[in-house]
């Protein structure tokens, strides 16, 4: 099993490319199921979840051609994927392909909308709380779908005599990104108008909507909490570039800040990271949009002030940045309180940070109080390298950030979590001067 060996203490300096967003690429791959015409996606990241999704749709009978440099030393090689679902023969997502990736549920809406039936295994792939799919099911039922859950599968079909879903006004009980995406895709081929209330406003949802519009969909209000979709009879193919990954960009912002570096994040979108950037600036980090990306300069963590925050839905502070910013707080000055409101069980990185010397106390798995090490000694206290174990995707990133500033060697085990969401992370960090390598 692969591990990352990190020798800390080097500032990150230079330029780093930000890849396409996993959370946009996955639904956009599923959007190709909505049409019989070819679809071409650019800037598709090289990630385990993307590879799993491609295997899933290929298993359905979709022709998939991928042009990507498999060499992770070429960290800026944007991937191109061409998909042709014209001969799709099996509208089914079996458990053996779905079990490692929750996003496979995104195939449900497109398959049902285009073929009138779909069989999708209940998803797996994430250890963070329950993340129920009931909002997907309720929304599709409101559009006329008949759905039963049995033997671990969601079996969906249109009522006898119906050839299309019907438009509906749908208000989800909670803000759900994948739920919004699934219902958005299904609604593009429904009869009449669909209104999604309490819709997710994330940039990845808006980017999916932009792709669907290129395919001929009629959508208004994406990027707001109310999305209107006027269904059409068919969609056509398109070319689309996946939006830059704001969470990868935020992760590198925290890594550069923690190490006292100076870097340009090429392709990064500052306007998608307002909540994170505001906290970094409050901490003492210089962050500014620059032509072609985001510039970040830091005096070093020991001179930064720890920042409290509360995770909320976009445009608030993203839950997917909680662990990385906590790692920065660990080595900054002062005390900060972090409240996690989106998912349960999302402090699993805390025990591993404690192994490196962090000072963190948690309450009920929802609130963490971090006593920064930056003010603990005249020269600033230090983390000390150790062997740590990744427990989920963003926890992995927080341990890497901590390892970059720790004294000595840090060994991060179970980095398959990292490979699910970061495109060639160690190659990009080496390009900024980090001493990091992948070992067996």
Swiss-Prot record:
Listed EC numbers: 2.5.1.7
Active site: 126 (proton donor)
Pathway terms, separated by semicolons: Cell wall biogenesis; peptidoglycan biosynthesis
Cellular component GO terms, alphabetical: cytoplasm
A GO molecular-function annotation: UDP-N-acetylglucosamine 1-carboxyvinyltransferase activity
GO biological process, one term: UDP-N-acetylgalactosamine biosynthetic process
Annotated phosphoenolpyruvate binding sites: 22-23
Keywords annotated in UniProt: Cell cycle, Cell division, Cell shape, Cell wall biogenesis/degradation, Cytoplasm, Peptidoglycan synthesis, Pyruvate, Transferase
Pfam families: EPSP_synthase
Residues engaged in binding UDP-N-acetyl-alpha-D-glucosamine: 102, 131-135, 320, 342
The family this protein is said to belong to: Belongs to the EPSP synthase family. MurA subfamily.
Protein name: UDP-N-acetylglucosamine 1-carboxyvinyltransferase
Species this protein is from: Acidovorax ebreus (strain TPSY)
Organism taxonomic ancestry: Bacteria, Pseudomonadati, Pseudomonadota, Betaproteobacteria, Burkholderiales
Gene this chain is encoded by: murA
């Amino acid at each position: 099993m692969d591990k990352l060996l990190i020798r800390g203490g080097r500032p990150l300096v230079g330029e780093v490319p930000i890849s396409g967003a996993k959370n946009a690429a996955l639904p956009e791959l599923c959007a190709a199921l909505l049409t019989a015409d070819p679809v071409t996606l650019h800037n598709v990241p090289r990630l385990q979840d993307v590879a799993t999704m491609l295997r899933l749709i290929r298993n359905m009978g979709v022709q998939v051609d991928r042009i990507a440099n498999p060499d992770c030393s070429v960290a800026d090689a944007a991937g191109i994927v061409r998909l042709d679902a014209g001969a799709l023969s099996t509208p089914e997502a079996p458990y053996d392909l779905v079990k490692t990736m929750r996003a496979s549920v995104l195939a449900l809406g497109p398959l049902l909308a285009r073929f009138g039936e779909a069989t999708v295994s209940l998803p797996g792939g994430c250890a963070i709380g329950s993340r129920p799919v009931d909002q997907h099911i309720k929304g599709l039922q409101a559009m006329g779908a008949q759905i039963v859950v049995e033997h671990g599968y969601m079996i969906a079909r249109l009522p006898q005599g119906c050839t299309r879903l019907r438009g509906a006004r749908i208000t989800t009980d909670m803000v759900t990104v994948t739920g919004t995406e699934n219902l958005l895709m299904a609604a593009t081929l429904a009869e009449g108008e669909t209104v999604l209330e309490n819709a997710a406003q994330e940039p990845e949802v808006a980017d999916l909507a932009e792709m669907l519009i290129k395919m001929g969909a009629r959508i208004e209000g994406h990027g707001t909490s109310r999305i209107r979709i006027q269904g059409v009879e068919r969609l056509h193919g398109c070319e689309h570039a996946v939006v830059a990954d704001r969470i990868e960009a935020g992760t590198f912002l925290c890594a550069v800040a923690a190490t006292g570096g100076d870097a340009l994040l090429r392709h990064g979108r500052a306007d998608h990271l307002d909540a994170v950037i505001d906290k970094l600036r409050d901490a003492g980090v210089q962050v500014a949009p620059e032509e072609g990306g985001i510039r970040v300069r830091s005096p070093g963590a020991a001179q930064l002030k720890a920042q409290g925050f509360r995770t909320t839905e976009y445009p608030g502070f993203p839950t997917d940045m909680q662990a990385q910013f906590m790692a920065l707080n660990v080595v900054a000055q002062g005390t900060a309180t972090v409240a996690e409101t989106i998912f349960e069980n999302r402090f699993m990185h805390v025990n591993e940070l404690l192994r490196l010397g962090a000072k963190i106390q948690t309450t009920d798995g929802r609130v963490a109080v971090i006593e920064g090490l930056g003010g603990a000694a005249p020269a600033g206290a230090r983390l000390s390298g150790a062997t740590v174990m990744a427990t989920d995707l963003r926890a992995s990133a927080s341990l890497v950030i901590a390892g970059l500033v720790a004294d000595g060697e840090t060994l991060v085990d179970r980095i398959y979590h990292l490979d699910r969401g970061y495109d060639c992370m160690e190659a990009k960090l080496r390009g900024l001067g980090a001493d990091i390598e992948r070992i067996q």
